[in-house]
Amino acid sequence: MDVTSYKKPEYFRNRELSWVSFDERVLNEARDKSIPLFERLKFISITSSNLDEFYMVRVASLKDQVHANYTKKDLSGMDAKEQLAGISKRTHELVQLQYNTYNRSAVPSLEHVGLTIISEHEKLTKEQAEYVDSYFEENIYPVLTPMAMDSARPFPLIRNKTLNIGALVQKKEDSLLSRAEDKKEKKGKEKEKEKELEFATVQVPSVLPRFILLPQDEKTGQRYVILLEEIIERNIGKLFLSYDVVCAHPYRVMRNADLSIDEDEASDLLKEIQKQLKKRQWGEVIRLEVEDKMDKRLLKMLEKEFDIDEDDLFRIPGPLDLTFLMKMYGLDGFDEYKIPKYIPAAVPALMNEDDIFTNIRKGDILDRKSVV
């Protein structure tokens, strides 16, 4: 008698790749035009937060297996390296689809209903620019902590999941000299000039809202928002007064946040958990997100410092970290583009009773005509 074995790899699907398919289904909700616009924004945000957690825990665990030379295959017949290769391919496709949805559907739809997201600070009107610069001076500048790297200062520790702006800066006297060079000598000086460039970074403060509402257009009624990182980029020269800013671009890292705790070996489980939670902020960098138009010199420096492979580098064609869309859902004036709030039906039979249990004992409440 021929007995079929159901343990063959072809009968199983890898758990991690299956999860990526799940997150893609979440994103598909954001692409469904039958769902109200602001509800679709929430699904884009959820896709982002899901992917962050997936990388910090599941992908991190697989990388730990690779570092430990653990080669055992899972039920689908894939070892850790094969799973990581498959995950990289699928998640890059997912992120591309996510930003296609954001750029081609969400942003134009928001503008159509009266809300414009200003994606580049160069597109600000004169009045908007004045408002933004004033907001920077009064609210943002006091909470910024710029950090630089040079021969005396190592590369700063970048915290997990934080949004940062990296910059290449050059001392002003060096910059003036380089501009005064003869054109014939300029090409020969390029390598020397690049050596003079220094790396600087500033964290986008989480204590401030991710997006700022700008004054409403009185004629059209159109409302405008700009992201916090765009305001900082516009004014980043004010943080480095002795330098010329050559370029500035946002970036973001995901670190290994998988907890590895041996409950049997830990003498104090609570202290061990607290210790592991602190380490999560400084674990190995497993994913780097950068603006797709980032300067190649800056990108090369980040790749080197974070020791990132091409598989774990995500070039983003839009704002990094789309979880801010969840906060945008709370904006007033767009209720018609949201699912109406559920209002539970009142039960008159229970409204005027001092003791509802006495009333319940009289019979099934749902059978009474006074329920609605």
Where are these regions (language model features)?
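N-terminal localization/anchoring segments of enzymes in phospholipid and broader phosphate metabolism
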Residues: 1-372
